[in-house]
Amino acid sequence: MKIVLQRVSQASVTIEGSIHGQIEQGLLLLVGVGPDDSQEDLDYAVRKIVNMRIFSDEAGKMNKSVQDVAGKILSISQFTLFADTKKGNRPAFTGAAAPALASQLYDAFNQALSAFVPVEVGVFGADMAVSLVNDGPVTIVLDTKNK
């Protein structure tokens, strides 16, 4: 799995003109699923995300997790994280998992996250408009194959 984490003060996802999910303080996740991803990758990602200390403590030091600050997560499926740009000018997305597998793992990932923090989601495979106010900015790329 490849996941882009962005610390936000607010974020929302709009589908066909209607807000489908929104959060205040927390994390916006752009989630890509690869063909070799498994439950082990999912568990690793969830553990890292809910415990990652990227929110400021009273001294201004990044020392708190999304759980510690009672934050929320907005999770958006993003197969384009697996883009291959080696040849030509049109990216190839053959490195992403097939939609059936990706959808299953994405749903399981969000379910696992929701055991720790409130989670809002987009719609898998939909065209979405994502809005955010990046806080910091703090943006981190998590790749479960680079443990």
From Swiss-Prot:
Gene3D superfamilies: D-tyrosyl-tRNA(Tyr) deacylase (3.50.80.10). Its EC number is 3.1.1.96. It is found in: Cytoplasm. Keywords: Cytoplasm, Hydrolase, RNA-binding, tRNA-binding. A motif (Gly-cisPro motif, important for rejection of L-amino acids) lies at residues 136-137. It is an enzyme of class 3 (hydrolase). It catalyses: glycyl-tRNA(Ala) + H2O = tRNA(Ala) + glycine + H(+); a D-aminoacyl-tRNA + H2O = a tRNA + a D-alpha-amino acid + H(+). GO terms for molecular function: D-tyrosyl-tRNA(Tyr) deacylase activity; Gly-tRNA(Ala) deacylase activity; Ser(Gly)-tRNA(Ala) hydrolase activity; tRNA binding. Its main location: cytoplasm. Belongs to the DTD family. This is D-aminoacyl-tRNA deacylase. The gene is dtd.
